[in-house]
């Protein structure tokens, strides 16, 4: 009798719908629906597997749940996905000498002097974030400038964009670099400043971080990202050491942010020969390979079709011949990887588009070839993206940071295809947004602000810079959620709060649809949730770490 009753109870339980774990109620929910329009909702039902069961609208009957969370009327957004960031660099930079915002060479020297005093010893001093465009002289620092402050141990300070570094004499000596050392193809050397490919001459001598140091840096990076509501990242230029740090975190159940990994060049494919499946409950996947076609605008390494307006003897740096770039990207594609190629100048973008057109003829248009930055483009080249199935992976805050410099570097005519977000949208080209952190802050909200206004957080310039390229808020949010998920082949798992997807979301302190662009850019995250679990909460009277 008891056995019969037990069997009946078991059958009834199996026939009943699963009892969901968590109900988020009383929320001002905003997301992008599949058609690209804003969808408003008031609650989420989250299953015990961490996935969305149901999106609730106003007036819907509240389902039962083990736990009910009152959102207090806060705005709830899908977790923001940064399509292009450098995760380990973010963590390491947060632990090293911070040079972001220095307004002169003298301020850089002062910060270096103070840091050296606080960190005595014989170890290398590493720092990052300087930008000579913010200095009155607008000239690169030199080895002599660093020697004047620290000469007894190696010092290496990386430019904000990661495309140049300055080394003191001790660092150059350790690397075996002399006045007669030639710059490699795709690089330049200027009195101790090493641009693009030339950076490798110094970097080869820098002691590699230990596994323990890498683990600390990765956890630091995750803390920063979660504080800004970033729940997923396209992890660009990932080394095998970086990958191993991610795996160690996953093995210890310390992998919180979802990572779509793009390996740095072909060398890692000797160890990871094909794309991996999703690991650690969809927290980690090696999906693509990252390549470079040129350098950066700030160091005049971006490869242009015509000379720089402020340096007529230079067109920038071409990293590869057409044949070389095709051979490398084809090797990655043949192994099943997606390709993501850095291209900033109009010549570099044209080369990458041509390369991808050839790959599409061979592999089809469904491989989602990515152009990273797609920053300065000949308007005639932009329509070529959609037929080849190319994704434009762009960073809105590059436009606000680069505006004055871009005008000086390019002149007015070449700006017609610069940071052309609305043109990309109108042509139906898949658009993904990110920040390129730590080049810019990983905070996505200044990016959303820039996208809808073409202004910085101070409202400059009045009326917006090339305002015809502004996006609607729905378009901008789509690029930071659904678009970034699509760019990483993750749209079935993240990018929206549709039923069946992971319940990754953020609660913020204001409704982004009801504030001006500058207030949108100052949005603060209150809580960050991943897989239906709260993983970050703002301490009272505290802001998330800056993390530039």
Model-derived features: where do they sit?
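Gram-negative bacterial Sec-dependent N-terminal signal peptides
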Residues: 1-19
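Divalent metal-binding segments
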Residues: 22-25, 31, 36-272, 291-348, ...
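Hydrophobic membrane-embedded alpha-helices
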Residues: 172, 186-189, 377, 384, ...
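Short proline/glycine-enriched turn/loop segments at secondary-structure junctions
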Residues: 277-278, 515-520
